[in-house]
Amino acid sequence: MEAATEMLRMLADGTRLRLMWLLSEGEHDVTALVAAVGMARPAVSQHLGKLRLAGLVSVRRDGRRALYRARGGHVRRLVTEVLHAAAHRVSGTPEHD
């Protein structure tokens, strides 16, 4: 239960949720993420570090670049479902299974 609470706490931050949305779609390096979220590189790196420690993000090296991605299908589906549920709430579209 504590691990689930920590994961959800990490997603409660708007910047981290946006990063997770991007990383759920595929691998990105820090430069691409900085451009996508419009924040300073150190801030993005700090958020990525927190997401990695929470087990939501994995990183692999490609030469000198670090490539980040959402860690596993469960995490990707969690992010997608949260964003879809929010979209339904905002648009007033009925929920579905």
Language-model segment annotations:
Residues M39-P42, A54, H88, D97:
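Juxtamembrane/interface motifs at transmembrane-helix termini
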Residues E2-P42, A66-H74:
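N-terminal helix-turn-helix DNA-binding core of bacterial DNA-binding proteins
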Residues M1-A3, G72-D97:
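Amphipathic alpha-helical dimerization/coiled-coil segments
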Residues R52-D62, R69:
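Beta-hairpin "wing" of winged helix-turn-helix
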Residues H47:
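Residues within the DNA-recognition helix of helix-turn-helix
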